[in-house]
Amino acid sequence: MEPVQKLQIPYKSIRLSDGTEYQSYHTEGALSGKQPADYKNGIPAFRKEWIQKRFNHSNHSQMYFAKKGIITEEMRYAAFRENMEPEFVRSEIACGRAILPSNRNHPELEPMIIGKNFLVKINANIGNSTFSSSIEEEVEKLHWAIKWGADTVMDLSTGKNIHETREWILRNSPVPIGTVPIYQALEKVKGKTENLNIQIFLETLEEQAEQGVDYFTIHAGVLLRYIPLTTNRITGIVSRGGSILAKWCQAHHKENFLYTHFDEILKVMKKYGVSISLGDGLRPGSIADANDKAQFSELETLGELTQLAWKEDIQVMIEGPGHVPMNLIKENVDLQTKICQEAPFYTLGPIVTDIAPGYDHITSAIGAAMIGWYGTAMLCYVTPKEHLGLPNKEDVKQGVIAYKIAAHAADLAKGHPGAIDRDNLLSKARFEFRWEDQFSLSLDPETAKTFHDEMLPQDRMKTAHFCSMCGPHFCSMNLTQELRKFAQEKEIQES
């Protein structure tokens, strides 16, 4: 086994004033989340030698190697990041309970694993629209998202220069990149849904896979017979990909071509080692529509497609809702686990109430924490701009932070090894009034420090045994320390 130090596992070292050092899971890559001086230089091709060793294989999926009993360098790397044994990572990938997204043409990738027995991961969406954003802005959004902790990023560009934008996102990304290929396929037919066909879609898949995309969202579960089931919904079909395929099905009175040609899609996946994220094109777009027949009928089909992909050794994760009230969340996980035989669940939130536009990073983080606790492997973030507009940098940060909180809360509830260590260190620093250590251990040190310093900016206040909330005479922790000191002195005197 290759020594850990030679693998250069990307941890962030947090040194505390009491001499303690905490190693934090780190997603920022070689540039530590900073914007490159010139995005056209890209970042180092980290996996180049690993990929070359396996170049002659006909199947480049990590599941293919895992089923053969081979522990790849990527598996070993992901295992060390998780503090797990490499054999455990291999076995989880082999049985389909976890995926390691890693296109052979994305050598810049620092491998990570998605599965319910590992740390809960989060995805951030970026991408331009017809109204705004340049390539430079999207690369900047990428680095901004991973600076705050995004484990994967999806490029959902629908505007100009889709190919070139994706190319430079990939060349600058240390995290897996996902896309929804139907968007670019639609752009190729100038937005005319009825002109889509399997040839155009496969050409688009090949183009994106050749660039290095690590996972594709494929809405192959939107079947012709399911479309009428959405008629009485309040919000109908809210998935962009789902609505595109539904419109095509109705225009031609034919079955979804992604479903009927799924075997051809798998051939592209196998060639490049791309993972499939089976899209929930009929997910509920309002809590009134949650857990309805349309949603769960599609889920049954996704279970069928999962088996087809696994037969070809293709890695699969299943996308989920959406908008779901808290009392219906567990049913989603239980059904997905049963129908899709524990393939990793990847959910958008879910949003638990529809009354808070502008705050849906909060309404969804509540649902995300719950669904992560129940076993969801990856959470797709929601920003404050959800339902309102294209998110800017600050929106991306707020979304990522909200979801890092949700994911960590789920890890704590699941009892993931080591998850509580950071909480304990921060609590100890808080009780001992080590303010700088509190800032360093927080998910957002800049905001924590800013809030503290608003009222108490002086350097001497960095060691003060109070904050501006309670002042020097009403701090419960300071009073507790005095009580303990008094009790210890009394005990010494009596002994």
UniProtKB/Swiss-Prot annotation:
It catalyses: 5-amino-1-(5-phospho-beta-D-ribosyl)imidazole + S-adenosyl-L-methionine = 4-amino-2-methyl-5-(phosphooxymethyl)pyrimidine + CO + 5'-deoxyadenosine + formate + L-methionine + 3 H(+). Its EC number is 4.1.99.17. One of its GO terms (biological process) is thiamine biosynthetic process. Substrate binds at residues 125, 154, 183, 219, 239-241, 280-283, 319, 346. InterPro entries: ThiC (IPR037509), ThiC/Bza_core_dom (IPR038521), ThiC/BzaA/B (IPR002817). Zn(2+) binds at residues 323, 387. Keywords: 4Fe-4S, Iron, Iron-sulfur, Lyase, Metal-binding, S-adenosyl-L-methionine, Thiamine biosynthesis, Zinc. GO terms for molecular function: 4 iron, 4 sulfur cluster binding; carbon-carbon lyase activity; zinc ion binding. One of its GO terms (cellular component) is cytosol. It is an enzyme of class 4 (lyase). The keyword Lyase applies. Binds 1 [4Fe-4S] cluster per subunit. The cluster is coordinated with 3 cysteines and an exchangeable S-adenosyl-L-methionine. Belongs to the ThiC family. This is Phosphomethylpyrimidine synthase. It comes from Leptospira interrogans serogroup Icterohaemorrhagiae serovar Lai (strain 56601). The lineage of its organism: Bacteria, Pseudomonadati, Spirochaetota, Spirochaetia, Leptospirales. The gene is thiC.
